[in-house]
């Protein structure tokens, strides 16, 4: 059955990877069994000799990655330390906790009260994100101490800690690796608003905020210059929302290789190897400051979404990824 047929009729909440797993099972002759009343949140994949269970949400769809490697990658600060030790250029940064709970187990210098001093060391401008966040939630530029305070107030409702990093500007790419081999690379682009000739940028942002909220993703209206808010976009005109480029937050991707692809791919490979990941999506900057050879890893994803491949009609790459997973846990022979 084509992947598009499996997608048809699924509820919007049904996990993408559950659909892809069923598609791969049909292709490779394995048994797929959904075990949560049709939600797709839990399922098993079985061969003639064994069965393996998978779960959505915080569950991993990449069993070839060890729990140690995957959880290390999920902590953006610790992952950065490990990569830096291996000689991988990263964005650096420091972490700060937002609540008093568990303070007895933490080293000094990383509480909310300490964030202001570090922020000033960065020139009172930084890129902020939750320490263990995903999908671009609360990932944004903070440009003043007042904005930092407001940001920490809001993010503390949902997360325990944040990472503050110096600002870098460049072209952003995602490199997807399986056992060190590049499966694909794609350039990431920021989200855009499309004018209707009637609505102001502020009004279009309100609609965007509402759509993001339904998916549990923060908005970034504070990152928009107030001078633009009342401007009415002509019909069809596109206006870039500054900041994050995650597809889940309205960004886009297209297949592309960096200008210095060999160097970029080598950087991604060193990052994955440093963390011990067999499957990983490495997000990196190239062309930093206009220098095409300047590159740094942004972060490493051990449980990345692959919806981009479905939307691009690359069912073959989805199957390659799931075959790699099935082989790694003994459901298929090499």
Regions found by a protein language model. Name each.
Residues 37-39, 96, 132, 285:
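Residue-level "edge-of-site" marker
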Residues 1-81, 103-105:
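ATP-binding N-terminal substructure of ATP-dependent carboxylate-amine bond-forming enzymes
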Residues 203-252:
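Extended, charge-rich helix/loop segments that form flexible
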Residues 59-60, 69-217, 262:
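Active-site nucleotide/adenylate-binding loops and adjacent lid/helix of ATP-dependent enzymes
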Residues 36, 162-166, 173, 277-290:
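A short glycine-rich, hydrophobically flanked beta-strand micro-motif that places a catalytic Asp/Glu
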Residues 42-54, 174-184, 290-308:
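A short beta-strand motif that forms the metal-chelation/ATP-contact edge
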Residues 243-266, 272-279, 286-334:
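C-terminal active-site "lid" helix and adjoining low-complexity regulatory extension at the edge
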Residues 1-9, 59-62, 98, 132-135, ...:
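A short, surface-exposed helix-loop junction/capping segment
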């Amino acid at each position: 059955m084509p992947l598009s047929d499996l997608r048809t009729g699924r509820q919007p909440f049904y996990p993408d990877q559950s659909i892809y797993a069923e598609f791969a099972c049909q292709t490779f002759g394995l048994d797929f069994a959904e075990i949560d009343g049709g939600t797709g949140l839990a399922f098993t994949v079985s061969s003639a000799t064994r069965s393996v269970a998978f779960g959505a949400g915080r569950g991993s769809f990449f069993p070839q990655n060890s729990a140690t490697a995957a959880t290390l990658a999920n902590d953006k600060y610790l992952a950065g330390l490990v990569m830096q030790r291996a000689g991988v250029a990263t964005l650096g940064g420091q972490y700060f906790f937002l609540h008093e709970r568990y303070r007895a187990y933490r080293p000094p210098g990383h509480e909310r009260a300490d964030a202001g001093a570090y922020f000033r060391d960065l020139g009172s401008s930084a890129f902020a994100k939750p320490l263990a966040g995903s999908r671009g939630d609360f990932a944004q530029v903070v440009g003043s101490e007042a904005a930092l305070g407001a940001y920490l107030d809001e993010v503390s409702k949902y997360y325990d800690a944040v990472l503050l990093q110096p600002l870098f500007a460049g072209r952003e790419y995602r490199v997807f690796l399986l056992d060190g081999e590049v499966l694909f690379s794609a350039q990431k682009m920021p989200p855009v608003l499309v004018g209707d000739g009637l609505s102001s940028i502020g009004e279009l942002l309100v609609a965007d905020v509402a759509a993001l909220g339904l998916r549990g993703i923060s908005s970034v209206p504070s990152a928009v210059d107030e001078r633009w808010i009342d401007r009415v976009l002509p019909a069809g005109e596109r206006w870039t929302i500054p900041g994050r480029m995650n597809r889940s937050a309205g960004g886009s991707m297209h297949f592309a290789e960096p200008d210095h692809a060999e160097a970029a791919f080598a950087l991604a490979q060193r990052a994955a190897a440093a963390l011990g990941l067999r499957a990983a999506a490495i997000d990196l900057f190239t062309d930093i400051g206009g220098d095409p050879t300047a590159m740094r890893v942004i972060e490493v994803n051990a449980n990345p979404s692959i919806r981009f491949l479905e939307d691009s009609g690359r069912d073959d790459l989805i199957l390659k990824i799931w075959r790699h997973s099935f082989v790694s846990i003994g459901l298929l022979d090499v």
